[in-house]
């Protein structure tokens, strides 16, 4: 059987305990099941056969209960009950499970559960919030970095001054001969000058394009072939020859009619002419030549 008074006299009443921490003001207890963290008779988990406490494991709160019936079984000494994440429901669970426990233990369990929930909420807020990470540096490293920065600034100022001087001399045309200057700065100055000239030429081209806006031009059709043009020329020639034939036939008919009228007038005598005089048109004669291929002589065998 477990005797609480005997255990307390041996452990807590000015005797040795492995969980006890002595200070000038009071004594503390390092046992994980201690409900208050103080070393006294009412809060000692070893000297109380009916005991309860609250523990947190990986963000989840559990209620641990100990009864005298399980004192003979150390493997089943503590009964664990998982508490709800809702604060009010968890308090109701504590009241339901600790009906027959002392009021002091019930009150301290609720108080411990409140503290645990508060620091869990604070942990969640800190994890979501960004924090500054302070990295300590030695004095030697700081001095070295400052010297490097100063040297880099001086070198940058010197390079800028050299570039400005090169640009001024290049504009003035002072480089008739070869000089021993930094090649990179000289090349950079030349590139800047080339960029400026290229921008001017592009501006001139844009002005020319603006001037050409609104002009009208005739463009040859790419779909017309030379064979089509030759066909059109042949058609024109045929049309011209047909017109000439018509004109020649008309002129011949008119001349024959005039001759007949003249013969009639001579036979009847002179008669007064009526109407307008008919003027004779110039007569055009057209001759056509046909070329025939000469017959080849038969070879005498």
From Swiss-Prot:
Biological processes annotated in GO? maturation of 5.8S rRNA; maturation of LSU-rRNA
Q: Which UniProt keywords apply?
A: Nucleus
Which InterPro entries does this entry report, sorted A to Z? Mak16, Ribosomal_eL28/Mak16
Biased amino acid composition, Acidic residues: 202-212, 219-234, 251-261
Q: Which GO terms describe its cellular component?
A: nucleolus; preribosome, large subunit precursor
- UniProt lists compositionally biased (Basic residues) regions at 265-282
Which parts of the sequence are annotated with region: Disordered?
A: 191-301
Where primarily located? nucleus
Tell where it localizes.
Nucleus, Nucleolus
* Range of residues in the leader sequence: none
Protein family per UniProt = Belongs to the MAK16 family.
Q: What protein does this entry describe?
A: Protein MAK16 homolog A
Q: Which organism is it from?
A: Xenopus laevis
Lineage, please?
Eukaryota, Metazoa, Chordata, Craniata, Vertebrata
């Amino acid at each position: 059987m477990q005797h609480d008074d005997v255990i307390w006299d041996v452990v807590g009443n000015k005797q040795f305990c492995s969980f006890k921490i002595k200070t000038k003001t009071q004594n503390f207890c390092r046992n994980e099941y201690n409900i208050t963290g103080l070393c006294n008779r009412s809060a000692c988990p070893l000297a109380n056969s009916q005991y309860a406490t609250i523990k947190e494991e990986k963000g989840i709160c559990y209620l641990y209960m100990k009864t005298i019936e399980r004192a003979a079984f150390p493997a089943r000494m503590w009964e664990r009950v998982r508490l709800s994440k809702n604060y009010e429901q968890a308090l109701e669970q504590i009241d339901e499970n600790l009906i027959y426990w002392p009021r002091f233990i019930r009150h301290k369990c609720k108080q411990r559960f409140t503290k645990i929930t508060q620091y869990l909420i604070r942990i969640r807020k800190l994890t979501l919030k960004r924090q500054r990470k302070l990295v300590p540096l030695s004095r030697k490293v700081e001095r070295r970095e400052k010297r490097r920065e100063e040297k880099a600034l001086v070198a940058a100022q010197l390079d800028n001054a050299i570039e400005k001087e090169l640009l001024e001399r290049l504009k003035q045309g002072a480089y008739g001969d070869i000089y021993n200057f930094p090649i990179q700065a000289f090349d950079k100055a030349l590139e800047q000058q080339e960029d400026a000239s290229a921008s001017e030429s592009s501006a001139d081209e844009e002005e020319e394009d603006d001037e050409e806006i609104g002009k009208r031009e005739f463009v040859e059709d790419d779909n017309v072939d030379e064979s089509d043009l030759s066909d059109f020329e042949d058609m024109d020639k045929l049309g011209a020859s047909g017109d000439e034939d018509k004109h020649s036939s008309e002129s011949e008919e008119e001349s024959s009619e005039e001759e007949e009228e003249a013969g009639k007038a001579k036979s009847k005598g002179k008669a007064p002419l009526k109407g307008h005089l008919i003027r004779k048109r110039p007569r055009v004669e057209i001759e056509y030549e046909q070329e025939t291929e000469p017959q080849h002589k038969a070879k005498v065998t």
